[in-house]
């Protein structure tokens, strides 16, 4: 009887500890919901800020999923029709206590500069699965990997555009320079004459054109993000995070110079689909166990191919069809994901892997994105 009472008390203490920490437990998987710092917006306003030392699970863990959405001060979801999420990223870094300098502890590649996030999406956030299947997990918090005297921390970069009252909401989302009345980039350097839209025109603090009679009302929004994880154990198979950018200019040089964005010209030949491709030599051997593409409006999908032309992973854009939150017409509200059967999507070390990104070319699109995020379990 005593041992039953002792077991009950242990379970009760465990439950109370989880409750006090804001944790939920489901089959050993821990879950916690966090809020980003406040993001203040006005109609047409752009916020593109980085937030350091955000809340994130502590300890040596395996992340199983990372989901989020934009909410207002009441905690209610915010529509893409009002606040467009151009992109968000979550990046790991190491920092010494009391020192501003930091070391970016990014993913496994492929770009030499940038694209170092562990997690990231855009408007497709709400309907894109991020769950890492068993027995795999994204390993973080390993004390043996943290430099002596440093602490592992995490940062958010959130690029949000308030399109309430916008003259051309889609044009604002594509960062058309004429709508932002911008001729210089954020570093006060003049834009090149042929640059008509993209990140250089919708940087933090810029404002897209709104209707003259529209009342400017301030709004505070937040990113509500939910992390699921398990404590690390030998039964978990670690996976590496890779991000393939279709603008990668690699040409057997070993240098992955990613341009980050590109334009899709309106077709003059009757071909309705624009295809952009890039090939790289893959640095390791392993199995693709999960993946999805990231694109902007106009995107159709993307696919990752092996050297022999086999499909390693493919992802299609999911468009909204109405006005409800999560179903906004004309917006990519989700991307399909791939979960290859174990062993069916193997990559050999130094194999040439090709990414193809597909966009509609019925009209012009500026500053588009062509990323493929995928997880690889390395071969032993």
Where are these regions (language model features)?
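Cleavable N-terminal signal peptides of Sec/SRP-targeted secreted and luminal proteins
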Residues: 2-18
């Amino acid at each position: 009887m005593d041992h039953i009472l002792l077991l009950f008390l242990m379970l009760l203490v465990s439950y109370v500890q989880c409750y006090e920490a804001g944790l939920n437990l489901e089959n050993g998987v821990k879950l916690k919901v966090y809020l980003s710092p406040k993001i203040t917006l006005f109609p047409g306003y752009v916020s593109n800020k980085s937030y350091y030392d955000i809340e994130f699970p502590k300890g040596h863990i395996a992340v199983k999923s990372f989901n989020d959405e934009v909410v207002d001060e009441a905690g209610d979801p915010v529509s893409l029709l009002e606040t467009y999420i151009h992109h968000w990223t979550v990046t790991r870094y190491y920092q010494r206590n009391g020192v501003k300098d930091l070391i970016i502890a990014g993913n496994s590649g492929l770009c030499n500069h940038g694209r170092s996030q562990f997690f990231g999406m855009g408007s497709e956030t709400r309907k894109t699965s991020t769950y890492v299947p068993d027995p795999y997990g994204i390993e973080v918090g390993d004390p043996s990997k943290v430099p002596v005297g440093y602490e592992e921390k995490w940062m958010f970069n959130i690029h949000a555009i308030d399109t309430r009252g916008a003259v051309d909401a889609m044009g604002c989302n594509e960062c058309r320079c004429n709508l932002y009345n911008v001729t210089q980039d954020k570093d006060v350097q003049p834009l090149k004459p042929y640059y008509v839209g993209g990140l250089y025109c919708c940087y933090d603090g810029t404002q897209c054109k709104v209707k003259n009679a529209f009342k400017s009302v301030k709004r505070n929004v937040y990113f509500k993000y939910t992390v699921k994880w398990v404590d690390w154990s030998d039964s978990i198979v670690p996976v590496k995070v890779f991000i393939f950018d279709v603008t990668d200019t690699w040409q057997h040089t070993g240098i992955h110079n990613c341009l980050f964005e590109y334009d899709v010209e309106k077709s003059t030949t009757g071909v309705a689909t624009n295809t952009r491709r890039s090939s790289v030599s893959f640095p390791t051997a392993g199995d693709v166990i999960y993946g999805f593409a990231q694109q902007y409006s106009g995107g159709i999908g993307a696919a990752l191919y092996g050297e022999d032309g086999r499909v390693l992973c493919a992802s299609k854009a999911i468009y909204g069809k109405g006005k409800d939150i999560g179903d906004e017409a004309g917006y990519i509200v989700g991307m399909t994901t791939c979960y290859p059967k174990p062993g069916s999507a193997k990559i050999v070390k130094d194999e040439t892997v090709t990414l193809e990104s597909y966009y509609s070319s019925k009209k012009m699109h500026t500053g588009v994105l062509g990323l493929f995020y995928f997880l690889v379990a390395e071969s032993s």
